């Protein structure tokens, strides 16, 4: 054990760093230059791809040469194709059959992201004979096990469900594993799958396994995971150069400063005016999403909702419905923020501010994706939150201030309050939404920016349709042991 530790430390010094210059002329960006197999090339042409993104041009050749890769790639850079093409080519060249079991495993943090990758796999493998499948939490475990026993050559999985099958599904053959992909590694660890990942890496064979790990942000935990999963001396590909901004280049980004009581009115006016566009609105809690979605649908502004309290089938249906729509509004929590490739989104609205610059970068990664992506992003800030801009500036995120003429803001406050008062169901969801907003606010990690005691609760309540703040209980702190009663505009701690 000590021996491997030492040799790994030594080999890390040999790690090769490739800084990608987006305009680099020394790299051929055509897919034809990769000498891909006939079935793969047919699929790529059918999908309408001809040129690689910078991430793909830098990553695919070394991966096809069998190198282990640690990729720092920002969301929307085309990394899904970057790891799928080499792994599919590997299965093809080894002539994998169902009886050989699983040759490639792709681990990804959320069910939505897994479905997303699986959709691309299905298109890319249309003309191949190899089998592919997906195992995710929330799906039917028995059906998954039956498929695994028949032999799934390329498997897309979320960590918890994968570990379950590795430990408990008899007849799941993975001894011939040739490639492991860990996508959105930082997110997998953030959600709390560190232990599962360690166990998975222990169980999987690593004799002649090629591994690749992708992460939008590099943290010590990501480094630890790469140390145990990659072979010594991986190729480190950084496609975010030092002077580069952290968000995709075709993205116009702005913020608007708005008092708490005017937030909903401004959002409503904006959505009403942009009904022909495709828009995603981010909120900080499931209950807020439920409330605003119910409300907007009730007042004839049709929206879709996506959040963690929905059943998996509902989330999947909603996601694909929004993907296939030419226009529409999706209201969601951060569960949908990472890596979901929703085509041609015109606007990202961050109605509740993100916890830190990394969340911001991942949220706006939904628009301006791929080689020629264009999109706009708008973040709502109350005056007390302007300090967040300093953090974004430090994270190299360029922002402009937008102003909205007050006479263009629909004053529907009195109608909103009447509706919330008279409709019992909406009144309840509004109260839950209000409570969850405060709860999420209290749990923000940037305490210097998001100070719950500075919130004007009367104004916050107005944005949920209450003329006077309702009494709600919230718990502050991860332990949940500090009950806090929020009443009128004071916060009493017991």
Swiss-Prot record:
Its main location: nucleus. Its EC number is 3.6.4.13. A motif (DEAD box) lies at residues 183-186. It is found in: Nucleus, Nucleolus. Residues 250-420 form the Helicase C-terminal domain. It catalyses: ATP + H2O = ADP + phosphate + H(+). Residues 60-236 form the Helicase ATP-binding domain. SUPFAM superfamilies: P-loop containing nucleoside triphosphate hydrolases. A motif (Q motif) lies at residues 29-57. Disulfide bonds: none annotated. GO terms for molecular function: ATP binding; ATP hydrolysis activity; identical protein binding; RNA binding; RNA helicase activity. Keywords: ATP-binding, Helicase, Hydrolase, Nucleotide-binding, Nucleus, Ribosome biogenesis, RNA-binding, rRNA processing. InterPro entries: DDX18/Has1_DEADc (IPR044773), DEAD/DEAH_box_helicase_dom (IPR011545), Helicase_ATP-bd (IPR014001), Helicase_C-like (IPR001650), P-loop_NTPase (IPR027417), RNA-helicase_DEAD-box_CS (IPR000629), RNA_helicase_DEAD_Q_motif (IPR014014), SPB4-like_CTE (IPR025313). The keyword Oxidoreductase does not apply. GO terms for biological process: maturation of LSU-rRNA from tricistronic rRNA transcript (SSU-rRNA, 5.8S rRNA, LSU-rRNA); maturation of SSU-rRNA from tricistronic rRNA transcript (SSU-rRNA, 5.8S rRNA, LSU-rRNA); snoRNA release from pre-rRNA. GO terms for cellular component: nuclear envelope; nucleolus; preribosome, large subunit precursor; small-subunit processome. Gene3D superfamilies: P-loop containing nucleotide triphosphate hydrolases (3.40.50.300). Residues 1-23 are annotated as: Disordered. A motif (Bipartite nuclear localization signal) lies at residues 262-278. ATP binds at residues 73-80. ATP-dependent RNA helicase involved in 40S ribosomal subunit biogenesis. Required for the processing and cleavage of 35S pre-rRNA at sites A0, A1, and A2, leading to mature 18S rRNA. The Q motif is unique to and characteristic of the DEAD box family of RNA helicases and controls ATP binding and hydrolysis. PANTHER family: RNA HELICASE. Belongs to the DEAD box helicase family. DDX18/HAS1 subfamily. Associates in the nucleolus with the 60S and pre-60S ribosomal subunits. This is ATP-dependent RNA helicase HAS1. It comes from Candida glabrata (strain ATCC 2001 / BCRC 20586 / JCM 3761 / NBRC 0622 / NRRL Y-65 / CBS 138).
